[in-house]
Amino acid sequence: MSQTVNIVGAGLAGSEAAYQLAQRGIKVNLIEMRPVKQTPAHHTDKFAELVCSNSLRGNALTNGVGVLKEEMRRLDSLIISAADKARVPAGGALAVDRHDFSGYITETLRNHPNVTVINEEINSIPEGYTIIATGPLTTENLAKEIVDITGKDQLYFYDAAAPIIEKESIDMDKVYLKSRYDKGEAAYLNCPMTEEEFNRFYDAVLEAEVAPTNEFEKEKYFEGCMPFEVMAERGRKTLLFGPMKPVGLEDPKTGKRPFAVVQLRQDDAAGTLYNIVGFQTHLKWGAQKEVIRLIPGLENVDIVRYGVMHRNTFINSPDVLNEKYELIKEDRIQFAGQMTGVEGYVESAASGLVAGINLAHKLLDKGEVIFPRETMIGSMAYYISHAKNEKNFQPMNANFGLLPSLEKRIKDKKERYEAQANRALEYLENYKKTL
Protein backbone atom coordinates (compact mmCIF):
# COMPACT_ATOMS: atom_id res chain seq x y z
CA MET A 1 0.00 0.00 0.00
CA SER A 2 1.78 3.14 -1.22
CA GLN A 3 -0.79 5.69 0.00
CA THR A 4 0.17 7.45 3.25
CA VAL A 5 -2.50 9.00 5.47
CA ASN A 6 -1.92 12.20 7.44
CA ILE A 7 -3.45 12.38 10.90
CA VAL A 8 -3.25 15.81 12.51
CA GLY A 9 -3.38 15.53 16.30
CA ALA A 10 -2.31 12.65 18.54
CA GLY A 11 -5.06 12.93 21.13
CA LEU A 12 -7.53 10.17 21.88
CA ALA A 13 -9.20 10.29 18.46
CA GLY A 14 -6.04 10.75 16.39
CA SER A 15 -4.20 8.01 18.26
CA GLU A 16 -7.08 5.57 17.81
CA ALA A 17 -7.43 6.40 14.11
CA ALA A 18 -3.68 5.97 13.57
CA TYR A 19 -3.74 2.57 15.26
CA GLN A 20 -6.71 1.30 13.26
CA LEU A 21 -5.09 2.33 9.97
CA ALA A 22 -1.64 1.03 10.89
CA GLN A 23 -3.02 -2.33 12.03
CA ARG A 24 -4.57 -2.71 8.57
CA GLY A 25 -1.27 -2.10 6.83
CA ILE A 26 -1.76 1.59 5.97
CA LYS A 27 1.20 3.94 6.41
CA VAL A 28 0.42 6.87 8.71
CA ASN A 29 2.06 10.23 9.34
CA LEU A 30 0.94 11.10 12.88
CA ILE A 31 1.46 14.85 13.21
CA GLU A 32 1.50 16.27 16.77
CA MET A 33 2.67 19.80 17.60
CA ARG A 34 3.50 19.04 21.23
CA PRO A 35 6.16 19.47 22.62
CA VAL A 36 7.25 21.94 19.88
CA LYS A 37 4.19 24.01 20.78
CA GLN A 38 2.16 23.36 23.91
CA THR A 39 -1.51 24.10 24.57
CA PRO A 40 -2.93 25.89 27.64
CA ALA A 41 -4.37 22.59 28.91
CA HIS A 42 -1.69 19.96 28.24
CA HIS A 43 1.23 19.22 30.56
CA THR A 44 3.22 16.53 28.71
CA ASP A 45 4.36 15.49 25.23
CA LYS A 46 2.55 12.13 25.47
CA PHE A 47 -0.19 11.05 23.07
CA ALA A 48 -3.80 10.85 24.29
CA GLU A 49 -3.05 12.95 27.39
CA LEU A 50 -6.11 13.22 29.64
CA VAL A 51 -6.49 16.93 30.36
CA CYS A 52 -9.67 16.83 32.46
CA SER A 53 -10.75 13.89 34.65
CA ASN A 54 -8.86 10.58 34.82
CA SER A 55 -12.14 8.68 34.57
CA LEU A 56 -13.49 7.13 31.38
CA ARG A 57 -16.82 6.94 33.24
CA GLY A 58 -19.11 3.97 33.84
CA ASN A 59 -18.06 0.46 32.91
CA ALA A 60 -21.39 -1.34 33.36
CA LEU A 61 -23.55 -2.28 30.39
CA THR A 62 -26.46 -0.41 32.00
CA ASN A 63 -24.52 2.76 31.18
CA GLY A 64 -24.32 4.17 27.64
CA VAL A 65 -20.59 4.75 27.73
CA GLY A 66 -20.10 1.29 29.24
CA VAL A 67 -21.75 -0.22 26.17
CA LEU A 68 -19.59 1.94 23.91
CA LYS A 69 -16.43 0.79 25.70
CA GLU A 70 -17.40 -2.87 25.32
CA GLU A 71 -18.07 -2.37 21.62
CA MET A 72 -14.65 -0.77 21.24
CA ARG A 73 -12.97 -3.62 23.14
CA ARG A 74 -14.45 -6.01 20.61
CA LEU A 75 -13.12 -3.84 17.77
CA ASP A 76 -9.52 -3.89 19.10
CA SER A 77 -9.49 -0.29 20.36
CA LEU A 78 -6.05 0.94 21.41
CA ILE A 79 -7.56 3.48 23.82
CA ILE A 80 -9.71 0.95 25.67
CA SER A 81 -6.86 -1.57 25.77
CA ALA A 82 -4.64 1.11 27.34
CA ALA A 83 -7.38 2.04 29.83
CA ASP A 84 -7.84 -1.57 30.91
CA LYS A 85 -4.09 -1.91 31.45
CA ALA A 86 -3.76 1.39 33.38
CA ARG A 87 -6.90 0.96 35.51
CA VAL A 88 -7.07 2.30 39.08
CA PRO A 89 -9.85 1.63 41.65
CA ALA A 90 -12.97 3.71 40.94
CA GLY A 91 -16.04 1.69 41.93
CA GLY A 92 -18.20 1.06 38.89
CA ALA A 93 -16.19 3.45 36.70
CA LEU A 94 -13.13 2.86 34.52
CA ALA A 95 -10.52 5.31 35.83
CA VAL A 96 -6.85 5.21 34.91
CA ASP A 97 -3.40 6.28 35.98
CA ARG A 98 -3.13 9.05 33.41
CA HIS A 99 0.66 8.70 33.00
CA ASP A 100 0.55 4.92 32.46
CA PHE A 101 -2.40 5.33 30.11
CA SER A 102 -0.85 7.90 27.77
CA GLY A 103 2.57 6.26 28.10
CA TYR A 104 1.26 2.94 26.78
CA ILE A 105 -0.47 4.61 23.83
CA THR A 106 2.61 6.70 23.00
CA GLU A 107 4.96 3.71 23.05
CA THR A 108 2.59 1.54 21.01
CA LEU A 109 2.33 4.10 18.22
CA ARG A 110 5.97 5.23 18.24
CA ASN A 111 7.06 1.60 17.90
CA HIS A 112 4.54 0.66 15.21
CA PRO A 113 6.25 -0.03 11.86
CA ASN A 114 3.46 1.72 9.93
CA VAL A 115 3.45 4.93 12.00
CA THR A 116 5.79 7.89 11.46
CA VAL A 117 5.54 10.55 14.18
CA ILE A 118 6.11 14.15 13.07
CA ASN A 119 6.37 16.80 15.80
CA GLU A 120 5.45 20.12 14.23
CA GLU A 121 2.62 22.63 14.15
CA ILE A 122 0.36 22.38 11.11
CA ASN A 123 -1.24 25.63 9.91
CA SER A 124 -3.04 24.25 6.87
CA ILE A 125 -4.74 21.01 5.94
CA PRO A 126 -2.21 18.65 4.29
CA GLU A 127 -2.66 17.30 0.76
CA GLY A 128 -3.95 13.76 0.31
CA TYR A 129 -6.04 11.68 2.69
CA THR A 130 -6.17 13.47 6.03
CA ILE A 131 -7.91 12.98 9.37
CA ILE A 132 -8.13 16.18 11.41
CA ALA A 133 -8.24 15.32 15.11
CA THR A 134 -6.84 18.50 16.64
CA GLY A 135 -9.38 18.62 19.43
CA PRO A 136 -10.84 21.45 21.46
CA LEU A 137 -7.63 23.50 21.38
CA THR A 138 -7.14 23.69 17.62
CA THR A 139 -4.66 26.45 16.76
CA GLU A 140 -6.00 29.68 15.30
CA ASN A 141 -4.50 29.30 11.82
CA LEU A 142 -5.75 25.74 11.36
CA ALA A 143 -9.13 26.71 12.81
CA LYS A 144 -9.48 29.44 10.18
CA GLU A 145 -8.79 26.95 7.40
CA ILE A 146 -11.33 24.54 8.89
CA VAL A 147 -13.91 27.32 8.90
CA ASP A 148 -13.08 28.08 5.26
CA ILE A 149 -13.37 24.46 4.16
CA THR A 150 -16.55 23.68 6.11
CA GLY A 151 -18.18 26.95 5.19
CA LYS A 152 -19.46 27.33 8.73
CA ASP A 153 -18.71 29.76 11.54
CA GLN A 154 -16.63 28.31 14.33
CA LEU A 155 -18.50 27.33 17.46
CA TYR A 156 -16.94 27.21 20.91
CA PHE A 157 -17.57 26.88 24.62
CA TYR A 158 -15.50 26.33 27.74
CA ASP A 159 -14.35 23.08 29.29
CA ALA A 160 -12.94 22.96 32.80
CA ALA A 161 -10.56 20.66 34.71
CA ALA A 162 -10.84 19.81 38.42
CA PRO A 163 -8.06 20.36 40.98
CA ILE A 164 -5.84 17.44 42.04
CA ILE A 165 -4.74 17.10 45.68
CA GLU A 166 -2.26 15.01 47.69
CA LYS A 167 -3.80 12.16 49.67
CA GLU A 168 -1.32 12.58 52.53
CA SER A 169 -2.67 16.06 53.22
CA ILE A 170 -6.27 14.84 53.64
CA ASP A 171 -7.55 14.54 57.23
CA MET A 172 -8.59 10.88 57.04
CA ASP A 173 -10.46 11.11 60.36
CA LYS A 174 -13.05 13.35 58.70
CA VAL A 175 -13.62 11.39 55.48
CA TYR A 176 -14.81 7.87 54.68
CA LEU A 177 -14.32 5.36 51.87
CA LYS A 178 -17.49 4.48 49.96
CA SER A 179 -18.95 4.27 46.47
CA ARG A 180 -22.47 5.58 45.84
CA TYR A 181 -25.08 2.93 46.74
CA ASP A 182 -22.05 0.67 47.52
CA LYS A 183 -21.71 -0.11 43.80
CA GLY A 184 -18.46 -1.89 42.93
CA GLU A 185 -15.48 -1.50 45.21
CA ALA A 186 -15.44 1.30 47.80
CA ALA A 187 -13.31 3.64 45.73
CA TYR A 188 -14.18 7.23 46.64
CA LEU A 189 -13.12 9.25 49.65
CA ASN A 190 -16.17 11.17 50.83
CA CYS A 191 -16.09 14.50 52.65
CA PRO A 192 -19.44 14.87 54.49
CA MET A 193 -20.93 18.30 55.19
CA THR A 194 -23.53 19.53 57.63
CA GLU A 195 -26.05 22.10 56.40
CA GLU A 196 -24.08 24.84 58.17
CA GLU A 197 -20.81 23.74 56.55
CA PHE A 198 -22.46 23.58 53.13
CA ASN A 199 -23.96 27.06 53.47
CA ARG A 200 -20.58 28.50 54.45
CA PHE A 201 -18.97 26.75 51.47
CA TYR A 202 -21.73 27.83 49.07
CA ASP A 203 -21.52 31.48 50.09
CA ALA A 204 -17.73 31.42 49.67
CA VAL A 205 -18.07 30.00 46.15
CA LEU A 206 -20.44 32.79 45.14
CA GLU A 207 -18.02 35.41 46.47
CA ALA A 208 -14.87 33.79 45.02
CA GLU A 209 -12.95 35.61 42.30
CA VAL A 210 -13.20 34.11 38.82
CA ALA A 211 -10.31 34.20 36.34
CA PRO A 212 -10.91 36.71 33.52
CA THR A 213 -11.79 35.69 29.95
CA ASN A 214 -11.41 37.58 26.70
CA GLU A 215 -14.37 39.86 26.06
CA PHE A 216 -14.95 38.50 22.56
CA GLU A 217 -15.36 34.94 23.83
CA LYS A 218 -18.92 34.26 24.84
CA GLU A 219 -19.02 31.61 27.53
CA LYS A 220 -21.06 28.62 26.45
CA TYR A 221 -20.77 25.52 28.61
CA PHE A 222 -21.43 21.86 27.89
CA GLU A 223 -23.53 20.59 30.80
CA GLY A 224 -21.23 17.60 31.48
CA CYS A 225 -18.17 19.72 32.26
CA MET A 226 -19.62 22.84 33.85
CA PRO A 227 -17.59 24.85 36.41
CA PHE A 228 -18.98 24.30 39.88
CA GLU A 229 -19.16 28.05 40.51
CA VAL A 230 -21.47 28.33 37.46
CA MET A 231 -23.62 25.52 38.89
CA ALA A 232 -23.70 27.39 42.21
CA GLU A 233 -24.94 30.54 40.48
CA ARG A 234 -27.99 28.58 39.34
CA GLY A 235 -29.12 28.17 42.94
CA ARG A 236 -28.22 26.52 46.23
CA LYS A 237 -29.86 23.21 45.32
CA THR A 238 -27.99 22.81 42.02
CA LEU A 239 -24.83 21.58 43.76
CA LEU A 240 -26.89 19.37 46.09
CA PHE A 241 -28.46 17.63 43.10
CA GLY A 242 -25.16 17.67 41.21
CA PRO A 243 -21.59 16.91 42.31
CA MET A 244 -22.39 17.31 46.03
CA LYS A 245 -25.49 15.11 46.20
CA PRO A 246 -25.42 12.90 49.32
CA VAL A 247 -27.85 10.21 48.10
CA GLY A 248 -26.41 6.71 48.52
CA LEU A 249 -23.43 7.99 50.51
CA GLU A 250 -24.52 7.42 54.11
CA ASP A 251 -21.69 7.83 56.61
CA PRO A 252 -20.74 4.30 57.79
CA LYS A 253 -19.81 5.69 61.23
CA THR A 254 -23.26 7.13 61.91
CA GLY A 255 -25.45 5.38 59.33
CA LYS A 256 -26.89 8.80 58.49
CA ARG A 257 -26.92 10.68 55.22
CA PRO A 258 -24.90 13.93 55.32
CA PHE A 259 -26.48 17.17 54.08
CA ALA A 260 -23.91 17.31 51.27
CA VAL A 261 -20.88 15.27 50.18
CA VAL A 262 -17.75 16.15 48.23
CA GLN A 263 -16.24 13.06 46.58
CA LEU A 264 -12.53 12.51 45.95
CA ARG A 265 -11.47 10.04 43.25
CA GLN A 266 -8.07 8.33 42.99
CA ASP A 267 -6.06 9.93 40.18
CA ASP A 268 -2.94 7.76 39.95
CA ALA A 269 -2.04 4.07 40.28
CA ALA A 270 -0.02 4.66 43.44
CA GLY A 271 -3.05 6.20 45.17
CA THR A 272 -1.14 9.31 46.24
CA LEU A 273 -3.24 11.81 44.26
CA TYR A 274 -6.98 12.44 44.25
CA ASN A 275 -9.15 14.72 42.16
CA ILE A 276 -12.22 16.50 43.46
CA VAL A 277 -15.12 14.97 41.53
CA GLY A 278 -17.22 17.47 39.59
CA PHE A 279 -15.18 20.45 40.81
CA GLN A 280 -13.89 21.64 37.46
CA THR A 281 -13.49 25.36 37.93
CA HIS A 282 -12.55 28.72 36.53
CA LEU A 283 -11.81 30.34 39.89
CA LYS A 284 -8.49 32.09 40.42
CA TRP A 285 -5.94 29.86 42.13
CA GLY A 286 -5.97 31.74 45.43
CA ALA A 287 -9.76 31.57 45.52
CA GLN A 288 -9.64 27.85 44.74
CA LYS A 289 -7.42 27.21 47.75
CA GLU A 290 -9.71 29.20 50.07
CA VAL A 291 -12.86 27.46 48.88
CA ILE A 292 -11.41 23.93 48.84
CA ARG A 293 -10.08 24.32 52.38
CA LEU A 294 -13.64 24.90 53.60
CA ILE A 295 -14.41 21.26 52.73
CA PRO A 296 -14.25 18.99 55.83
CA GLY A 297 -11.06 16.92 55.70
CA LEU A 298 -9.38 19.30 53.27
CA GLU A 299 -8.63 22.15 55.70
CA ASN A 300 -4.87 21.75 55.20
CA VAL A 301 -4.87 20.09 51.80
CA ASP A 302 -1.99 20.43 49.35
CA ILE A 303 -3.19 21.18 45.82
CA VAL A 304 -0.80 19.75 43.24
CA ARG A 305 -2.71 21.02 40.22
CA TYR A 306 -5.24 23.80 40.28
CA GLY A 307 -8.35 23.70 38.17
CA VAL A 308 -8.00 25.35 34.78
CA MET A 309 -10.31 26.31 31.95
CA HIS A 310 -9.79 26.26 28.23
CA ARG A 311 -11.78 26.90 25.09
CA ASN A 312 -13.35 24.00 23.25
CA THR A 313 -13.92 24.15 19.49
CA PHE A 314 -16.30 22.01 17.45
CA ILE A 315 -17.83 22.13 13.99
CA ASN A 316 -21.45 22.05 12.88
CA SER A 317 -21.15 18.39 11.93
CA PRO A 318 -24.72 17.57 10.80
CA ASP A 319 -24.33 20.01 7.93
CA VAL A 320 -20.81 19.04 6.85
CA LEU A 321 -20.00 15.42 7.86
CA ASN A 322 -21.42 11.99 7.02
CA GLU A 323 -21.55 8.87 9.22
CA LYS A 324 -17.99 7.98 8.21
CA TYR A 325 -16.82 11.31 9.68
CA GLU A 326 -15.96 12.41 6.13
CA LEU A 327 -16.32 15.98 4.92
CA ILE A 328 -19.27 15.73 2.54
CA LYS A 329 -17.91 18.13 -0.04
CA GLU A 330 -14.31 16.84 0.08
CA ASP A 331 -14.24 13.24 1.25
CA ARG A 332 -10.43 12.93 1.30
CA ILE A 333 -10.76 14.84 4.59
CA GLN A 334 -12.20 13.34 7.75
CA PHE A 335 -12.66 14.81 11.20
CA ALA A 336 -12.48 12.90 14.47
CA GLY A 337 -12.72 13.64 18.18
CA GLN A 338 -14.45 16.36 20.15
CA MET A 339 -14.48 18.81 17.28
CA THR A 340 -17.07 16.57 15.56
CA GLY A 341 -19.56 17.05 18.39
CA VAL A 342 -18.95 13.85 20.29
CA GLU A 343 -18.34 14.67 23.94
CA GLY A 344 -16.10 12.66 26.22
CA TYR A 345 -12.87 10.70 26.15
CA VAL A 346 -14.42 7.41 25.04
CA GLU A 347 -16.69 9.03 22.48
CA SER A 348 -13.73 10.90 20.97
CA ALA A 349 -11.72 7.70 20.67
CA ALA A 350 -14.73 5.94 19.14
CA SER A 351 -15.01 8.56 16.41
CA GLY A 352 -11.32 8.04 15.62
CA LEU A 353 -11.90 4.31 15.45
CA VAL A 354 -14.76 4.72 12.95
CA ALA A 355 -12.84 7.26 10.86
CA GLY A 356 -9.71 5.08 10.81
CA ILE A 357 -11.49 1.86 9.88
CA ASN A 358 -13.45 3.64 7.15
CA LEU A 359 -10.39 5.20 5.57
CA ALA A 360 -8.52 1.88 5.67
CA HIS A 361 -11.45 0.17 3.95
CA LYS A 362 -11.59 2.90 1.32
CA LEU A 363 -7.87 2.59 0.54
CA LEU A 364 -8.10 -1.19 0.46
CA ASP A 365 -11.24 -1.13 -1.74
CA LYS A 366 -13.25 -2.97 0.90
CA GLY A 367 -16.31 -0.70 0.92
CA GLU A 368 -17.72 1.72 3.47
CA VAL A 369 -18.23 0.94 7.16
CA ILE A 370 -21.54 2.20 8.57
CA PHE A 371 -22.07 0.67 12.00
CA PRO A 372 -25.72 -0.19 12.77
CA ARG A 373 -27.69 2.46 14.63
CA GLU A 374 -28.54 -0.22 17.20
CA THR A 375 -24.89 -0.07 18.32
CA MET A 376 -23.66 2.79 20.48
CA ILE A 377 -20.74 3.49 18.14
CA GLY A 378 -23.15 3.61 15.20
CA SER A 379 -25.65 5.81 17.00
CA MET A 380 -22.94 8.37 17.82
CA ALA A 381 -21.90 8.53 14.15
CA TYR A 382 -25.55 8.89 13.19
CA TYR A 383 -26.11 11.68 15.72
CA ILE A 384 -23.25 13.88 14.56
CA SER A 385 -24.30 13.51 10.92
CA HIS A 386 -28.08 13.72 11.31
CA ALA A 387 -28.91 15.96 14.31
CA LYS A 388 -31.30 18.41 12.71
CA ASN A 389 -31.09 21.32 15.12
CA GLU A 390 -28.19 22.86 13.21
CA LYS A 391 -28.54 26.30 14.77
CA ASN A 392 -27.95 24.85 18.21
CA PHE A 393 -25.99 21.64 17.54
CA GLN A 394 -24.61 20.48 20.88
CA PRO A 395 -21.92 17.92 21.81
CA MET A 396 -23.35 14.58 22.89
CA ASN A 397 -22.23 11.83 25.26
CA ALA A 398 -22.98 8.18 24.58
CA ASN A 399 -26.44 7.45 26.00
CA PHE A 400 -29.30 5.04 25.48
CA GLY A 401 -31.50 7.85 24.17
CA LEU A 402 -29.51 7.76 20.93
CA LEU A 403 -30.44 4.13 20.25
CA PRO A 404 -33.62 3.09 18.40
CA SER A 405 -36.49 1.98 20.63
CA LEU A 406 -36.89 -1.71 21.38
CA GLU A 407 -39.61 -3.56 19.48
CA LYS A 408 -41.24 -4.49 22.78
CA ARG A 409 -41.47 -1.70 25.34
CA ILE A 410 -39.83 -2.44 28.71
CA LYS A 411 -41.01 -0.19 31.53
CA ASP A 412 -38.21 -0.90 34.04
CA LYS A 413 -35.30 1.37 33.08
CA LYS A 414 -32.51 -0.99 34.17
CA GLU A 415 -34.06 -3.93 32.30
CA ARG A 416 -34.62 -1.73 29.24
CA TYR A 417 -30.98 -0.60 29.23
CA GLU A 418 -29.81 -4.20 29.61
CA ALA A 419 -31.94 -5.23 26.64
CA GLN A 420 -30.62 -2.35 24.52
CA ALA A 421 -27.05 -3.22 25.53
CA ASN A 422 -27.50 -6.88 24.62
CA ARG A 423 -29.05 -5.89 21.29
CA ALA A 424 -26.16 -3.48 20.59
CA LEU A 425 -23.52 -6.14 21.18
CA GLU A 426 -25.46 -8.70 19.14
CA TYR A 427 -25.68 -6.27 16.21
CA LEU A 428 -21.99 -5.46 16.57
CA GLU A 429 -20.95 -9.11 16.49
CA ASN A 430 -23.03 -9.70 13.37
CA TYR A 431 -21.65 -6.58 11.68
CA LYS A 432 -18.06 -7.51 12.56
CA LYS A 433 -18.39 -10.56 10.32
CA THR A 434 -18.67 -8.22 7.32
CA LEU A 435 -15.52 -6.24 8.14
Swiss-Prot record:
Transmembrane segments: none annotated. The keyword Ligase does not apply. Keywords: Cytoplasm, FAD, Flavoprotein, Methyltransferase, NAD, NADP, Transferase, tRNA processing. InterPro entries: FAD/NAD-bd_sf, MnmG-rel, MnmG-rel_CS, MnmG_N, TrmFO. GO terms for cellular component: cytosol. It holds the Pfam family GIDA. Belongs to the MnmG family. TrmFO subfamily. This is Methylenetetrahydrofolate--tRNA-(uracil-5-)-methyltransferase TrmFO. It comes from Staphylococcus haemolyticus (strain JCSC1435). The lineage of its organism: Bacteria, Bacillati, Bacillota, Bacilli, Bacillales. The gene is trmFO.
